[in-house]
């Protein structure tokens, strides 16, 4: 009997040690990170959907009923506008309002700043180097998704980010049967906005997280610039196991497991490309799409006055698996 008690006590202590060693998942305890799939963020910084997470007095953000409380700015943070000014935004996305660009007049600095207020950890976590790299990485990845540049384009190919708004060609409806995220009649879930979010199973949880019904109104991502930026920031800040969030990677919070190291997934910009589209672009040696992302990143780091860091490529990384965007590329 004493042995049983000792074993039970040991198990309990081991569980508590594991819990204490785990990093919080959301809210002010996690740099303003948001819970995935519409889960509530508890006052202690954990994601869930029971009363302990969502109930009055227990929920700090993404709570049911009413507006989402804004977590306080995390330590080491600060005003996003002090890192990227309106003039820098215009310099980075120099040709976004070119007459040839579908997104002319849509993507604005004010819309970006307003959207970022819903994700207070973005661009405000860590030291100045981490903050600048996050902004450079976010705009590099989204610029690749929306680029209108070409090799001999005026000012170079990396001055043409945010040219496109909707997926080009003749996209399908991207509707996958789902009981949780059912497709609305007549709606299409092709790529839209900075990150080109696609599929009903992404529009659904994204809409829930930002407080908009995107299943019934997917084109809000292409008609409301604040919602458009929020869709990209939601993707950026949201982890999808086994993948970390892009945010956690670029600020240095993510630490690779033994499995990640065996797959050559080491902290740096390359892992973010793996998160976004690793199934098609990573582990293939030199890939022009990966190099395009890196080209944008290097340019934006130069404008922001920060070094790009290490591990920019994913050519020798094994993929995490299918990304949110893999079927749209």
UniProtKB/Swiss-Prot annotation:
Residues 24-65 form the Chitin-binding type-1 domain. The 4-hydroxyproline residues are not glycosylated in this plant vacuolar protein. It is an enzyme of class 3 (hydrolase). It catalyses: Random endo-hydrolysis of N-acetyl-beta-D-glucosaminide (1->4)-beta-linkages in chitin and chitodextrins. It is found in: Vacuole. Its EC number is 3.2.1.14. InterPro entries: Chitin-bd_1 (IPR001002), Chitin-binding_1_CS (IPR018371), Endochitinase-like_sf (IPR036861), Glyco_hydro_19 (IPR016283), Glyco_hydro_19_cat (IPR000726), Lysozyme-like_dom_sf (IPR023346). Its main location: other. GO terms for cellular component: vacuole. The keyword Transit peptide does not apply. GO terms for biological process: cell wall macromolecule catabolic process; chitin catabolic process; defense response; polysaccharide catabolic process. Residues 1-23 form the signal peptide. The modification 4-hydroxyproline is found at residues 67, 69, 71-72, 74-75. Induction: By ethylene. The active site is at residue 145. Keywords: Carbohydrate metabolism, Chitin degradation, Chitin-binding, Disulfide bond, Glycosidase, Hydrolase, Hydroxylation, Plant defense, Polysaccharide degradation, Signal, Vacuole. Residues 323-329 form a propeptide. GO terms for molecular function: chitin binding; chitinase activity; endochitinase activity. Disulfide bonds join 26-41, 35-47, 40-54, 59-63, 101-163, 175-183, 282-314. Belongs to the glycosyl hydrolase 19 family. Chitinase class I subfamily. Defense against chitin-containing fungal pathogens. PANTHER family: CHITINASE-RELATED, ENDOCHITINASE A. This is Endochitinase A.
